[in-house]
A protein has these predicted regions:
Chain A
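Aromatic- and glycine-rich beta-strand/loop motifs that create alpha-glucan
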Residues: 1-25
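Hydrophobic alpha-helical transmembrane segments in multi-pass membrane proteins
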Residues: 22-27, 64, 68, 101-118, ...
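Secretory targeting signals
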Residues: 35-37, 53-56, 62, 96-160
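Membrane-embedded or membrane-proximal helical elements that form or frame transporter/channel pores
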Residues: 37-78
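Terminal transmembrane helical anchor/hairpin motif
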Residues: 39-53, 162-165, 169-239
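Short alpha-helical transmembrane interface motifs in multi-pass membrane proteins
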Residues: 67-72, 97, 101, 129-134, ...
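Hydrophobic/aromatic residues in alpha-helical transmembrane segments
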Residues: 67-74, 147-148, 223, 227-228
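Helix-loop-helix units of permease transmembrane domains in multi-pass membrane transporters
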Residues: 74-103
Length: 239, 303
């Protein structure tokens, strides 16, 4: 088994053994369920419209959930930090291991958040495709939050400060469309497209699997993971 | 089994290493070498620089100046493969409290590229069999320390670095740790405050004071001769070459490029030849190395 897969298995096992995974899934399922009931479902709306609103706002929740997962994984691993720093493994293997564990937890979180949306489907409204596309959009938003959280914690000494830094970056990206209105037209399109959920979850929330949006979100995630690996390698030498 | 270090090379070379935390010096121009198989104790009071030096050797801290080589590798090199030849137990053992002892050691063995039986072997070696299935978070301090040592040796390293391995252990646990360390066939560098234990484990002692190496002596120096340290001149024949010319290849031991162990009877001739070649003699030591001498260095109290 490769080092990254071994680390991923350990981290996922740790999430399970400490109860953090179940607390995460329960909280996420509850928050998303309440969100659907409170904001999305309205008797004047069609089921498609309700699901679209649910999957749009829920994507922001998934980004936050990814950040929380990153913070949890880093805090859990801190006491044994010296283990990887003295082991013959590279920083990117450790980051990949943590990311894989977090991505699996994010995937489970998406499934745990689908219970009320599935009830909509079970009642004869909406479609399986809409739920799948919305779930994919959520997953991509979640792993982006996770990767940005890992990047922040890799660069800063305190995990909480790192997760907050990752969150600030995410918020800054999501606010880009507001900045876009105030800049020259040449930059406007670029800045508008930088917002992960605002600009790249639109197709998913409407039940369409858009490959270009998936590529953008995965590309941003990959860039964050590369940054995390660089930061982690530098931390190997930190006092 | 990890690959051996290059033949004849010292297991550890520390050459002019300094380390500063902001403007505060933790190590100042420390130089020494450790031969393969040697057991060396790093002594000094709190804040003397022991932990900083061990962290630099373990490759988790970079020196502000100077050069380090350990197990045939420069710790700063990008390829981390050399770490398979190193075992390190820091002051706080790097443990995952949520895992069982056996699962944790299997995990560490796999990360360090050891064979499948390594975890079972080290569990028996460290007498952890009765606790193998227990969660690490539920173990006493003594057993946590033992698991920490097990993770450092699970992959059978060539060089083992231990930072206060006996801290907080009761007498029985300390004796068990000593027996275990005496049974290991590797190069050992450990820091400890327990002078009586150090005297039983180590064959050589390095004393740090305010970041400087102030004493370097061995348990058998009186029998084996004297230790000579040289500041080489920029030109002319190297110190090593002069020693070969004066006493022959078999009558001295090169600890590193600048430190040699020579027979007591040769010291006058060697010193004359080195000075004539322009080299500076930094130290010529023939200490006795006993527990009483260690206690004399540090006074009644442990360092």
């Amino acid at each position: 088994m490769s080092a990254a897969r071994r680390i991923a298995a350990r981290e996922l096992g740790a999430l399970h053994r400490t109860g953090a995974l179940w607390a995460f899934l329960g909280t996420l399922g509850l928050v998303q369920g309440l969100h659907l009931l409170a904001f999305a479902v309205d008797e004047r709306r069609t089921s498609e419209r309700a699901l679209a609103i649910f999957f749009h706002h829920g994507a922001y929740v998934m980004e936050a959930a990814g950040l929380v997962l990153a913070l949890t994984l880093v805090v859990m691993g801190t006491p044994a930090d010296m283990l990887w720093r003295t082991a013959p493994i590279r920083a990117h293997q450790r980051i990949a291991g943590r990311f894989i564990a977090g991505a699996v937890a994010t995937g489970l979180g998406v499934l745990a958040s689908m219970h009320l949306a599935a009830l909509v489907l079970w009642s004869g409204y909406g479609s399986v495709g809409h739920l799948v596309a919305g779930g994919v959009g959520w997953f991509l938003a979640g792993v982006l939050g996770l990767a940005l959280g890992l990047a922040g914690t890799a660069f800063l000494r305190r995990p909480l400060a790192g997760a907050i830094a990752g969150g600030c970056l995410l918020v800054a990206l999501e606010l880009m469309p507001m900045v876009a209105d105030r800049v020259r037209p040449g930059w406007r399109a670029v800045l508008t497209e930088a917002a992960p959920v605002w600009a790249h979850n639109d197709a998913f929330r409407r039940g369409i699997l858009d490959l270009s949006d998936a590529v953008f979100l995965l590309g941003l995630t990959y860039a964050a993971l590369v940054a995390a690996s660089v930061g982690q390698e530098d931390r190997r030498w930190a006092p | 089994m990890p690959p051996p270090s290059p033949d004849g090379a010292p297991a550890i070379v520390v050459a002019g290493v300094s380390r500063f935390y902001a403007a505060q010096p933790a190590l100042r121009g420390v130089s020494f070498g450790v031969a393969p198989g040697e057991r060396v104790a790093l002594l000094g009071r709190n804040g003397a620089g022991k932990t900083t030096l061990l962290r630099i050797l373990a490759g988790v801290l970079d020196p502000s100046a100077g050069r380090v080589q350990i197990a045939g590798a420069d710790p700063s090199e990008p390829d981390p493969g050399w770490r398979a030849r190193l075992g390190f137990l820091p002051e706080q053992p790097p443990l995952h409290d949520d895992m069982s002892v056996a699962a944790y050691l299997e995990y560490v063995a796999e990360l360090r590229g050891a064979d499948a039986a390594a975890a079972e072997r080290v569990i028996a070696q460290c007498e952890l069999g009765s606790h193998a299935g227990r969660r690490i978070g539920t173990l006493s301090h003594g057993f946590r320390q033992r698991v920490g040592l097990a993770q450092a040796i699970v992959h059978q390293p060539q060089v083992l670095l231990l930072d206060e391995p006996a801290a907080g252990l009761d007498p029985a646990q300390t004796a068990a740790l000593r027996t275990l360390l005496q049974s290991l066939e590797l190069t050992l560098l450990l820091s400890s405050h327990l002078l009586s234990e150090v005297a039983r484990i180590a064959t050589r002692y390095l004393v740090l004071e305010e970041g400087r190496l102030v004493r370097d002596f061995g348990a058998s120096d009186e029998q084996e001769g004297v230790r000579l340290r040289v500041e080489p001149a920029s030109g002319g024949p190297a110190p090593h070459r002069i020693l070969v010319d004066v006493v022959g290849t078999t009558s001295f031991e090169a600890i590193d490029e600048c430190t040699f162990r020579i027979a007591t009877g040769d010291r006058a001739a060697v010193c004359r030849a080195l000075i004539a070649a322009g080299h500076e003699l930094v130290a010529l030591e023939r200490p006795t190395s006993t527990l009483s001498e260690l206690e004399a260095i540090f006074g009644e109290a442990a360092p």
